[in-house]
Amino acid sequence: MLALILTISICIFLKGSTCSYINLGSEGIVFGAPNCPVDIPLTCTNSTPIDNSCCFESPGGILLSTQFWDYYPPIGGNESFTLHGLWPDNCDGTYEQFCDDSLNIRSATDIVLNQFGDKVLYGKMSEFWKNFNGNDESLWIHEFNKHATCVKTIRPTCYDNQRYVKNKNVYDFYNITMNLYEKLPTFQFLAAEGIVPSLTQKYSKKQINDALTKYFGKAVYFKCNKYKALQEVWYYHYLQGSLKEENFSPIDTIINSNCPEENIQFIPKNGFNPGPQPPKSPRKGYLESPGKKGCLISNGLWYEAGTCATYAISQQEFGGYKIRSSKGYCGMNSQGQFTCNKQVDPTKNQFQYNKDTRKIGYGGNFAWCLDTEHKHGDGKTAQTPIKISDGQCDSFPVQYGGK
């Protein structure tokens, strides 16, 4: 009877909702869902704090379904964008990453296929959730450890203790991510408006924007590579209730496309070969701030009196950049300070690097501040940690100066 009552209340709520899509479990309820109020607001729209973190996703209230079109080397089917992930971004566009090591996993296949026996889900993941290097499993693990550990509403504590089994949150994340991807067939959206892969035909930004907006209902972010070719598409959503309820509400993208206004390529898979490419070597240079005295030394601290350290910046396997000095890889410590030493794991510290401005960012934020409360020494010889700005300090950019 309880299940029936809960089912009815959810269905009534859905009929009055603006949500475009939702999946319910076979019993008519979402497994292990908490007793969430039916009138809980969409994420990022609340005027007062929501205490129940099992019913309201925060701070990652923007959910992005991200898809890639990898044409060289060709990844995935010729008529499908591949799934990259489901990301919880903060309402201001910044984001957390690798939030809880205790939730990390080492295998996705064991959980989806062996523990839960879901051959259908595993088959879909294998076909559409592809890694450019051929190791799909490593991408699935990375996406969970980096992003899903930051999703508060699918923490194990948000499940009914009597019905929760180990790794149910992992299985749910993969299943929900795939469900949302299947509702966003980017290739078909574009093809329906005459935008198809071609080595000769080129398209305008307006054509692509109008096509995606028509079928998603809101403005969509799309990204081009250095060849002015379409490569990524991101769909932004707010969420109502727990992620387990899959009550996504489309919203406009909060960032602008980098694609040119005209002559955008949509290159067929197997239809492009750039020729021999020189090996990529790490960029090397100083980390400093234009007009600001000082720079970063090898331990990651800001110093005014000495010689700047040389930092190497290179791309990570799954996106983002890793930074290294003579002391070791660099990352953000438990106090939120930039630090470099041999204990830092670069795979858990993905920085951003804007090639045009040469600015370094972390978690979507490119503003840094001096943590003067924890400086070492005084005067010109003081060594001061830097941290990502919280909006309450005198911020400055950290810029890479190539040698």
UniProtKB/Swiss-Prot annotation:
Major enzyme class: lyase
Gene3D superfamilies: Ribonuclease T2-like (3.90.730.10)
Entry-linked InterPro entries: Ribonuclease_T2_eukaryotic, RNase_T2-like, RNase_T2-like_sf, RNase_T2_His_AS_1, RNase_T2_His_AS_2
Location of the protein in the cell: Vacuole lumen; Cytoplasm
Disulfide bonds: C36-C55, C44-C91, C54-C158, C99-C150, C224-C259
Annotated spans, Disordered: 268-288
Catalytic machinery residues: H84, E143, H147
Catalytically driven reaction(s): a ribonucleotidyl-ribonucleotide-RNA + H2O = a 3'-end 3'-phospho-ribonucleotide-RNA + a 5'-end dephospho-ribonucleoside-RNA + H(+)
Known EC number: 4.6.1.19
Key words of the record: Cytoplasm, Disulfide bond, Endonuclease, Glycoprotein, Hydrolase, Lyase, Nuclease, Signal, Vacuole
Extent of the signal sequence: 1-19
Glycosylation sites: N78, N175
One cellular component term from this protein's GO annotations in UniProt: cytosol
GO terms for biological process, alphabetical: apoptotic process; cell morphogenesis; mRNA catabolic process
GO molecular function, one term: ribonuclease T2 activity
Role summary: Rnase which modulates cell survival under stress conditions. Released from the vacuole to the cytoplasm during stress to promote tRNA and rRNA cleavage and to activate separately a downstream pathway that promotes cell death. Involved in cell size, vacuolar morphology and growth at high temperatures and high salt concentration.
Family: Belongs to the RNase T2 family.
Protein name as it appears in the record: Ribonuclease T2-like
Species classification: Eukaryota, Fungi, Dikarya, Ascomycota, Saccharomycotina
